Amino acid sequence: MAENFYLDNADIKFNLMNLGLEDVVRMREADYAQARDFPDAPVSFADALDSYDRVLAMVGEICGDLIAPRAADVDEEGARCEGGKVTYAKGTQENLRNLSQAQLMGVMLPRRYGGLNAPVTVYTMMTEMVSRADASLQNLFGLQDIAETINRFGTEDQRQRFLPRFAAGEADGAMALTEPEAGSDLQAVQLKAHFDREKNQWYLNGMKRFITNGCAKVLLVLARSEEGTRDGRGLSMFVCERGPNLLVRRIENKMGIHGSPTCELQFNNVPAELVGERRRGLTRYVMSLMNGARVAISGQALGVAEAAWRNALKYAHEREQFGKPIIKFPAVYDMLVSDRVQILAARALLYETTRHVDMRDNWDEAIRHAAAPSAEMRQQEKAYGRTAAELTPLAKAFCTELANRVAYNGIQIHGGTGFMKDFPAERYYRDARITNIYEGTTQLQHVAAIGGIMQRVLDPLMTEMSLLPYEGKLRRLASAVDMGREKLQRAVKFVEARNDGDYFDLMARRLCDMETQVLCGYLMLRHALKDKGREAAAERYILDTQPLLAMHYEVITSGDFSLIDNREAILAL
């Protein structure tokens, strides 16, 4: 019997049921008033949870029964480009058809456009399972943020024309941001957008590179709309459709995620429409897209980690050496235990992150539809916006680095067989490698998160969790996390007092790691408080991270500039 990737992973359901999504769902369902107009809308929070549980079980069944068995063939066949036309692998085409038939291509879109109106949290759980089945498919299924961006920032006419097509699976999307000379530095984008007044029409001209699913029917394009500008203030966001003037020059021959075409595009006077306001393409709309992309890739990475870990665990039980299964050897089982605990911590962080993203989006939506937004509404949107802005890069950094480590360990546990294509371990390793690069490298996630860390944005959340009614072992573990938090706070003050840009940049990674370790320690304790069976995992996570916290603290507060002063001499060796 095939696996159900939701029913066989109790941790996803545990997070769904214990996150505290009451306010998220209530606001998204307009105090459940949508039930008057849509028969499938929930009438209460319990009804909503039951609906999410059922749809996640359906996704889990599709992943286990259909998508996962095709993954090896998809990886082998890959996408191909012939004469400018991109063709997905046969298995990818079947996967997309299955997901469309299950009405899963407009998960977050409002019901009036044919969507499920599900929160980001539930959608991310789906993307995690899809990624566990086939990481490359997530790069197609997970691009639903394209439609969500049009929903949030487009005109009603644009919503009416585009969103029902996305929800029905008739249109797919891509975000065309990166250019040959503008990778992470999107302020350097040069693709031109010019407005023809006679035709009342925008046109796009230029090149884009490394565009995931660039062969899509609908593209969101970052382009320079203001003549003579060189920075982000001259960029706007446009939507265009695939046509004869939009050429796929080639697709990249990649290490992994072969089922997802990564395209080089040439725009030759492609008709386009402005999305939102001019000049806000980078500062407002791309930042929103990137926040969504961070969450999506975190889910993708977590799915790969789950797949790699399960595969390694299965092999360790089956493979015998020296007269016993290798799972019996401490060097093997300790690796598997450590990875499992880290996956649980990463999942706790990811879904705490999506909860804050959901609340930020809910308040943003409330403000946009309010005749006169109150000061309290704006305060709530700002507060959740700040926490989401720190949590999303921390989650991406943690989940993607973890995926690479778990996939690496999976091959190690397989030994020489893990290096062979006969086993999926090497595919997980190849697929994991891109996750901490695209949609912002881990180093850029540290840059994105460090401002919030220095401002102690997450302190109220940490304080709230530190004051939960822990007893016995959990109280002792909570005290250890509290001590780690004190070290973190002193490290932040030390770096702030140095007032040295180079030192600040050098220590950003360590501060991000400390923040993540402390926050995940509290999250693991909160989970253990709800389920006593999770005490052992919380204990292992906290005992493993305490020495790392201490090490980072000692390095940061040493004030040692030798790594800066001696860098040229070391690099010259």
Question: Where is each model-derived feature located?
Answer:
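Charged, glycine-rich active-site and insertion segments that engage polyanionic ligands
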Residues: 384-417
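Extended, charge-enriched "interface" segments that sit outside catalytic cores
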Residues: 1-82, 86
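A short core secondary-structure module
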Residues: 201, 205-246
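Internal helix-loop-helix
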Residues: 60-61, 90-164, 168, 212-214, ...
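Glycine-rich phosphate/cofactor-binding loops in nucleotide/flavin-utilizing enzymes
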Residues: 2-39, 145, 406, 416-479, ...
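C-terminal amphipathic alpha-helical interaction region
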Residues: 456, 468-573
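A glycine-rich, basic-preceded beta-loop-alpha segment at the flavin cofactor/substrate interface
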Residues: 243-244, 254, 261-293, 310-327, ...
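C-terminal helix-coil-helix/basic helical segment that borders enzyme active sites and/or dimer interfaces
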Residues: 344-396, 492-506, 525-529
